[in-house]
């Protein structure tokens, strides 16, 4: 059974939750052993996969969990706005560290390495390639280039203003076009995640609402301050 077939089976059985275990940079939680513990807890709670950033975090997590890991490396580049797995060396390092799926930025922006080359490198390692996209055009272009999975990860993050709500219409449009879609980005409640499935998502990635304690506390603090004013 292929990994996609196994994921199809697991998603059908448990609902398709993927947990992104990426603490706020510099947080007390931003340590490989804590990231790995989060991932293990997510697996034990029914997550079908986890999304992990960074080689040290990935290695530690791989030693603890059995679910597939979506691996990424984030970089801040002077010459490009692309942050997610921009280099071929990043793909190689993620493959060696134990990722089963490698995600790359799939947007049509200036970049050091073409999306096509990154996807080909992932497949060279016999791994699944995921493209983090911002639009229907991005998603369809990456699908044509061979991406196995299209994520809505970048929707709302390539423009000056980021909406509060997730991009459900993008999920539907990509699904209707025949893409295997992971809904990602601002799915901050179970209701929104469930709505993504109704719109055609294959699975839903949730990050901040589960693993970023500072964000969750901020939401509660803001609500309490408004109630008290």
UniProtKB/Swiss-Prot annotation:
Pathway assignment: Amino-sugar metabolism; N-acetylneuraminate degradation; D-fructose 6-phosphate from N-acetylneuraminate: step 3/5
Entry's Gene Ontology cellular component terms: cytosol
Source organism of this protein record: Salmonella typhimurium (strain LT2 / SGSC1412 / ATCC 700720)
Keyword Isomerase: yes
InterPro entries, sorted: Aldolase_TIM, NanE, RibuloseP-bd_barrel
Keyword match Isomerase: yes
Keywords: Carbohydrate metabolism, Isomerase
Family: Belongs to the NanE family.
HAMAP family per record: ManNAc6P_epimer
Primary role: Converts N-acetylmannosamine-6-phosphate (ManNAc-6-P) to N-acetylglucosamine-6-phosphate (GlcNAc-6-P).
Protein's name in the database: Putative N-acetylmannosamine-6-phosphate 2-epimerase 2
GO biological process: carbohydrate metabolic process; N-acetylmannosamine catabolic process; N-acetylneuraminate catabolic process
NCBIfam families per record: PRK01130.1 (NF002231)
Catalytic activity: an N-acyl-D-glucosamine 6-phosphate = an N-acyl-D-mannosamine 6-phosphate
A single MF term (Gene Ontology): N-acylglucosamine-6-phosphate 2-epimerase activity
EC number of this enzyme: 5.1.3.9
Lineage, broadest ranks: Bacteria, Pseudomonadati, Pseudomonadota, Gammaproteobacteria, Enterobacterales
């Amino acid at each position: 059974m292929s990994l996609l077939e196994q994921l199809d089976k697991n998603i059908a059985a448990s609902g398709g939750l993927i947990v992104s275990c990426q603490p706020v940079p510099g947080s007390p939680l931003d340590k490989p052993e804590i990231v790995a513990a989060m991932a293990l807890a997510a697996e034990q709670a029914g997550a079908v996969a986890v999304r992990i950033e960074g080689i040290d975090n990935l290695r530690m997590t791989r030693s603890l969990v059995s679910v597939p890991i979506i691996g990424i490396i984030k970089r801040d580049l002077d010459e490009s706005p692309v942050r997610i797995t921009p280099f071929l060396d990043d793909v190689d390092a993620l493959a060696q560290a134990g990722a089963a799926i490698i995600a790359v930025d799939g947007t049509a922006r200036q970049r050091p390495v073409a999306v096509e080359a990154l996807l080909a490198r992932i497949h060279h390692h016999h791994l699944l390639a995921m493209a983090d996209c911002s639009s229907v055009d991005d998603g369809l272009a990456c699908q044509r280039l061979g991406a196995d999975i299209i994520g809505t990860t970048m929707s709302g993050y390539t423009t000056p203003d980021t909406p509060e709500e997730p991009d459900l219409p993008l999920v539907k449009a990509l699904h209707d076009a025949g893409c295997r879609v992971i809904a990602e980005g601002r799915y901050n409640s179970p209701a929104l995640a469930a709505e993504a499935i109704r719109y055609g998502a294959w699975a839903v990635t949730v990050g901040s609402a589960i693993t970023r304690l500072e964000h969750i506390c901020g939401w509660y603090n803001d609500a309490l301050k408004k109630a008290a004013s």
